[in-house]
Regions:
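Short beta-strands and strand-loop turn motifs
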Residues: 1-3, 141
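Catalytic alpha/beta core domains of metabolic enzymes, predominantly
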Residues: 7-111, 115
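Conserved short secondary-structure transition element at the edge of the structured enzyme core
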Residues: 62, 66-71, 109-145
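Short, intrinsically disordered, charge-balanced linker/junction segments flanking boundaries
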Residues: 147-150
Length: 150
C-alpha cells in the first residue's frame, strides 16, 4: 500500500489499512503523508503484525519513525547519498542515538538541495534535477510536471 494523499487526494484510514493488512497479497505500507500522528496510529494498530511492514517516505522523519518501530524508509535522498542513509539505518539498528542525531541533521541539510520548489511534485522535480546534474539520469518527468532547469 502507498499512502500519499498530496498526490492522489485519497487518505488511507488506519482502520482500512489494518483490515487490508490481513490480505495475503498485501505485505506493507509506505507512508509519504509526513503526518507523524497518522504514522504513530499505524504503528499502534499494526505493530503486533510481524508479516506487515511499515515504511516512511519523507527522510526527515526516518529516524523518528524507525525509533518508534517502523521497518525503515523509502527515501529519495538515498539515490543521492546512499552511504548517508545506510549509516543512518545502522545507527538506528544499533541504538546509537548520538550518531542518529548527527546523521539526521545531515539528511535535513541534504534535503535543502531538492526541496526548494513548492507543490506536490517539487521534491521529485528537485531530486531528478540534482541526479541529472550528477550524470546519474536524464531530467525527464511525466506530463504535466516540467523538469527544473539550471
Amino acid at each position: 500500500l502507498y499512502n500519499m494523499p498530496s498526490h492522489v487526494k485519497v487518505f488511507l484510514e488506519p482502520a482500512t489499512v489494518k483490515t487490508l493488512a490481513n490480505h495475503s497479497n498485501i505485505i506493507g505500507l509506505k507512508d509519504s503523508s509526513a503526518n507523524m500522528t497518522y504514522f504513530q496510529t499505524l504503528l499502534y494498530h499494526l505493530g503486533d503484525n510481524p508479516d506487515f511492514s511499515l515504511y516512511v517516505g519523507p527522510e526527515e522523519l526516518t529516524g523518528e519513525c524507525v525509533l518508534l518501530g517502523a521497518d525503515g524508509g523509502v527515501n529519495g535522498g538515498a539515490n543521492l547519498c546512499p552511504e548517508l542513509f545506510a549509516s543512518l539505518y545502522r545507527a538506528l539498528r544499533d541504538s546509537d542515538l548520538e550518531q542518529v542525531r548527527r546523521l539526521q541533521a545531515e539528511v535535513l541539510e541534504l534535503g535543502k538541495l531538492y526541496r526548494s520548489r513548492p507543490g506536490a511534485a517539487g521534491v521529485i522535480r528537485g531530486l531528478k534535477y540534482e541526479l541529472s546534474r550528477r550524470g546519474l539520469l536524464k531530467n525527464v518527468l511525466a506530463f504535466p510536471a516540467l523538469p527544473l532547469r539550471g
